[in-house]
């Protein structure tokens, strides 16, 4: 089994992990009901997309 020749320093470890940060997802408000949804997706609350009802939502 391969073993590292030298201990990885804290700065090298942190530089390697610099691209692992999580980014917050974009949220927009639904034009029909105002709930927060991901863009370009059907609203789960009211079933509308681009001003048209595309899915019937049961209450």
Curated annotation (Swiss-Prot):
Alphabetical list of Gene3D superfamilies matching this protein: Single helix bin (1.20.5.640)
Database matches in InterPro entries: Ribosomal_bL32, Ribosomal_bL32_bact, Ribosomal_zn-bd
CC per GO annotation: large ribosomal subunit
Protein keywords: Ribonucleoprotein, Ribosomal protein
Keyword DNA repair on entry: no
Record keyword Transport present: no
Pfam families linked: Ribosomal_L32p (PF01783)
Record-level Gene Ontology MF annotations: structural constituent of ribosome
SUPFAM superfamilies: Zn-binding ribosomal proteins (SSF57829)
Single GO BP term: translation
Domain of life where this protein originates: Bacteria
Family: Belongs to the bacterial ribosomal protein bL32 family.
PANTHER family documented for this protein: 50S RIBOSOMAL PROTEIN L32, LARGE RIBOSOMAL SUBUNIT PROTEIN BL32
The protein's name in its UniProt record: Large ribosomal subunit protein bL32
């Amino acid at each position: 089994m391969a073993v590292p020749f030298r201990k990885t320093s804290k700065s090298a470890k942190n530089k390697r992990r610099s691209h692992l940060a999580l980014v917050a997802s974009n949220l927009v408000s639904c034009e029909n009901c105002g709930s927060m949804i991901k863009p370009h997706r059907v609203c789960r609350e009211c079933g509308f997309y681009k001003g048209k009802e595309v899915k019937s939502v049961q209450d």
